[in-house]
Amino acid sequence: VSGYRRDVYIPEEWKGKRLLLTIDGAAHESEVYWNGKKIGEHHCGYTAFTMDISDDAVYGIRNTLVVKVDSRESVNIPPFGFVIDYMTYGGLYREVWLDIKEKTYLKDVFVRGDLSGDTGRLISEITADGSGENLSVRQKIRRCGESGYRLLGECEMTGTKLVLDYTVESVLSWDTVHPVCYEVCTQLIRDEKVLDENVTVTGFRHAEFKADGFYLNGKKVKLRGLNRHQSYPYVGYAMPESMQRMDADILKYELGVNAVRTSHYPQSHYFIDQCD
């Protein structure tokens, strides 16, 4: 069992906002305290969790965050059950951050792209938190590295969930040799004011398995891959963004693989982003 403590200054100007505390990875059972009050717990060491501390924060002074992490095996917490064949290192091993949002904000944006020829299809599942009238969602897109966005459209949002489906002309495809990626900017708007903004990186590709193998964008591709665990010698799981990205580069450029299985749990989003 280990403990982590950090003092956090909360300025007065954050009053009336949403303060969202996210812990990206705490192995394996954790309890979170804010100014001595328990505000949450989590029972998995591989998934992120978020707590709203808006009502618990004291503004204009330093607040105290404490995280208690229990790294012992338990049959009630994945991946335990006395059958796993890998080490499950403990502790607070990924980042912790605080997002400052408006009362109504984008809670989740899930984007996926498909491809037919040079025409892309972009499907977005959008979840908002909060309430109010006159809400709309605007989406725009650009190729990564370009300066200007092109508008996809704007749609009224009457509830907390919205699905958008756009056709995007003249796109470049994503594949393992030329991994062209696009930034999708999603904005939550009320009366022409942008309340929140989310930028998601995606690509346009069509993947399918047929009887004779795997096809990417209509071309047969032989998958050469391996399993990847997130542990490192001497340090366990606790490695920064630079090492996560370098590991993906090693797999591609030194080992020559074009596929990786993230065994057996959600891994660092930095590693996943570098694979993209």
Predicted regions mapped to residue ranges:
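Accessory beta-strand-rich segments of carbohydrate-active enzymes
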Residues: V1-D108, S131, R261, Q267-H269
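Beta-strand-rich binding/interaction modules
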Residues: V32-W34, T119-E156, L162
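Conserved, mostly hydrophobic/aromatic
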Residues: G36, V96, Y182, G218, ...
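Short hydrophobic beta-strand segments in globular cytosolic domains
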Residues: I39-G40, L152, V221
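Aromatic sugar-binding surface patches on proteins
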Residues: T47-T50, T158-V168
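Extracellular recognition modules
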Residues: V66-K68, E183-Q187
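N-terminal carbohydrate-binding accessory modules
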Residues: V109-F110, S173, C185-Y253, D273
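Aromatic-lined substrate-binding rim segments of carbohydrate-active enzymes
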Residues: A248-D249, Y253-D276
